[in-house]
Amino acid sequence: MSTVNLSNFIDMLRLGCKNIANNFEYINQLNVFPVPDGDTGTNMKVTLSEAFKKLESEISHIKSFSDLGKSFTRDLLLFSRGNSGVIFSQIMKGFFSDMISTKTATETELGIEDFATAFIKAEEVAYKNVSKPVEGTMLTVIRLISTDFKNQKNRAKTVQKLFEQVIKTAWQTVKKTPQMLPVLKASGVVDSGAYGFACFLEGMLSFYGEKATLNDGKLTSAELSQMTISGEKHVTEEEFGYCTEYVLKLGMSVSQEVEKQKFNQKKFESKVSKIATSVVVASDKDNGFVKVHAHTEKPNLLLELGLNYGEFELVKIENMNLQVAKQKPAPVKRNIKPAIVVTVPTEAFADRIREDYDIQAILCTDDTGAPSVFSLLEAVKLTHSSNIIFLLHDKNYFLSANEALKQLKHQKISADCVMTTNPIESLAALTVFNSDLNIHTNVKTMRRFVKGFASATITQASKKYKENRIEVNKGDFIAVANNSICVSEKELVQCVFNTIDHLLKKVKKPEFLLAYYGKDITAEEAEAMKEKIEKKYKLFCEFSPGEQKVFSYILGIQ
């Protein structure tokens, strides 16, 4: 078949999500860094499963590929986790962009050309929205798939054959990723995000192994022209202003003195898009009608534009501000003092922060994984503040936080982000936070303090590795400071000592060592380690159970 209808395409998406779920553990194992916290597979699994779960809950409102694109891409972004989840959401945003912007409300079928456009748009939007695109990742996969269509290398006549060629290119690219990123080649793995994206596409193709025929559900132009303006609408939180719809009889004029302009749909849509959003323009050239649907704060401008081309047969305007107001509770009165949303690996760290700093907006990540945009925004609600600082203990959370910052800006909430490399650095940053000062001053002070703080994490290497002339064998104890391996030793005690030596070079007058020990360390072992450190270095030491899964110790020196 050269087309696929809406219902079957949703099934293809479902199978793509399922294939990620079936392979996420292996994708995690492709993590480059020897720290065994590879979470690309988990992030992609959670991103897709949550977004698809939301899609299924709204399935009665999904009447077209445009509806599908709006719903699925919105939720992919909200539920995206980690770099892989956010980048995947941008690829899919591009994939659906043409469907959302140009498909009418009754388009329920995609053809070969639609898919070609979708894959080309996927590349364009993804590369545009990722500030520093890196080759050798899932971005490269979508770029080379897009190139096949641009160069007409993918000339498939059926959707099944088209996806077979897409997946062939995807896997060929995945295999080449070690040649594009030296760090992949050194570790003997392919890029985990690229692999995950290929798995998703392969899952979509598996649809054709289960069903032999497709249902032809495309509406004819005659059926399109019979659309009525009435109908159920699903209002989302982003739909404000006036929902304006009208049917225009082109060329008709009530006055012989007024000559109407010649209608050009592309130019008309361009003009409408300048004064409105959610624009849908459907024309029936045979009968000389055009139907317009758009959201605008100034419906009078939209009506005046239409009158340049003809006369109205039907007009309907709904105030979405009132509709949304009925669905929403009264707005919460927000405090102007800055508040913090902080991520930590475990409840042990969360308890410390609650007790010492009375902060309640805390996200624990060891069990739930990287925070999604949605979870960050939900945490903001707990603060009741209009000035927010995200304090994140992992650089991989930046993309999700950055998207949350963009959405908070639309909500007129001022926000910024302080990135640290581990939870002890976050604790250090909290010591200089002052709610009586503004966000800018606090962020500047916190970043400066963290920059001068000496800390490291210690774990066991999950694979052989080499970095900065440091040889790492599987099972070695390694220390990571400032996102780089600084120590590798066979024995844990020696690794701790060498790590402290490394950190002391950064601190002029060391007095205090703070340590959180993980689940693999008993209280007795931690106490013995504390005594050895105090005896060797003459430092005051505080050891606490952190209960973290990955790191045996997280150390900080002041």
Swiss-Prot record:
InterPro entries: DegV_domain_contain, DhaL_dom, DhaL_dom_sf, FakA-like_C, FakA-like_M, YloV-like
Pfam (any one): FakA-like_C
Gene Ontology BP annotations: glycerol metabolic process
Chain segments annotated as coiled-coil in the UniProt record: none
Domain (DhaL) ranges: 7-206
GO molecular function: glycerone kinase activity
Superkingdom as given in the UniProt entry: Bacteria
PANTHER family reported for this sequence: DEGV DOMAIN-CONTAINING PROTEIN DR_1986-RELATED, PHOSPHATASE PROTEIN
This protein's name: Uncharacterized protein MG369 homolog
